[in-house]
């Protein structure tokens, strides 16, 4: 298939999964190095899922000064961070087992309510320098982060000025059996200068093409990342 030529995104396409993972890793490594050089410290937000996991494993082997890097999450399921279905567990076991000196900032705090965790996440991100990069994924339903089409909370999540919100995705197939979420919002993403969308497979490209032609972010929430001003969304797609 022919990838779309759209001025709203910067598209890099690959045929080899290894080349794809190495290219994304190099880009993230360069962003982190530049941020550490300029500010003395860097912060990176990561998504869950099997697609970015390959990149995290590769990034963990890079000779970065991990003691100067904070790792946060784009979104999280309302689960214990120790649960194997949580994004925190995935990041710990793909990246942090090797990059042991990085500081991890999970979204879920044991003993706190969902709303308290959202409050803490907003305090953390608003009282710190903005993350230098965010790694995003996209579901076959067009969701990114935990912004699910069909959620009754989606309109508020898209319009809020808060960086993080709680979202109930009950009834949304893409959310599976974990409807309660904490998610980064478009407002939170807008302050992050480098936004990378990682995609694998022809179906994901078809979804992206449909989203690019769609006019309503409520139908394809990935549009919230595509339509943000300033830096264009950088899409790394492996066929």
Curated annotation (Swiss-Prot):
Biological pathway: Carbohydrate degradation; pentose phosphate pathway; D-ribulose 5-phosphate from D-glucose 6-phosphate (oxidative stage): step 2/3
Molecular functions per Gene Ontology: 6-phosphogluconolactonase activity
Catalytic activity reported: 6-phospho-D-glucono-1,5-lactone + H2O = 6-phospho-D-gluconate + H(+)
Protein keywords: Hydrolase
EC number: 3.1.1.31
InterPro entries from the UniProt entry: 6-phosphogluconolactonase_DevB (IPR005900), Glc/Gal-6P_isomerase (IPR006148), NagB/RpiA_transferase-like (IPR037171), PGLS (IPR039104)
Biological-process GO terms, alphabetical: carbohydrate metabolic process; pentose-phosphate shunt
Protein name as it appears in the record: 6-phosphogluconolactonase
The organism of origin for this protein: Xylella fastidiosa (strain 9a5c)
Upper taxonomic lineage: Bacteria, Pseudomonadati, Pseudomonadota, Gammaproteobacteria, Lysobacterales
């Amino acid at each position: 298939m022919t990838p779309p030529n759209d001025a709203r995104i910067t598209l890099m396409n690959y045929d080899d999964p290894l080349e794809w993972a190495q290219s994304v890793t190099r880009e993230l490594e360069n962003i982190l190095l530049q941020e550490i050089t300029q500010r003395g410290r860097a912060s990176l937000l990561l998504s869950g899922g099997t697609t970015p996991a390959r990149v995290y494993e590769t990034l963990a082997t890079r000779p970065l000064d991990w003691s100067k890097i904070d790792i946060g999450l784009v979104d999280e399921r309302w689960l214990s961070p120790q649960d194997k279905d949580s994004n925190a567990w995935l990041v710990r076991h793909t990246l942090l087992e090797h990059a042991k000196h990085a500081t991890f900032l999970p979204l879920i705090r044991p003993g706190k309510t969902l709303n308290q965790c959202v409050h803490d996440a907003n305090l953390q991100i608003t009282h710190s320098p903005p993350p230098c990069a965010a790694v995003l994924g996209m579901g076959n339903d067009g969701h990114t982060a935990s912004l699910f089409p069909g959620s009754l909370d989606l309109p508020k999540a898209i319009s809020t000025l808060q960086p993080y919100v709680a979202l109930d995705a009950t009834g949304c197939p893409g959310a599976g059996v974990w409807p309660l979420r904490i998610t980064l919002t478009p407002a939170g993403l807008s302050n992050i200068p480098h936004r990378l969308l990682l995609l694998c497979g022809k179906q994901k490209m078809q979804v992206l093409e449909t989203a690019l032609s769609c006019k309503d972010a409520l139908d394809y929430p990935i549009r919230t990342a595509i339509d943000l001003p300033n830096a264009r969304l950088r899409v790394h797609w492996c066929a």
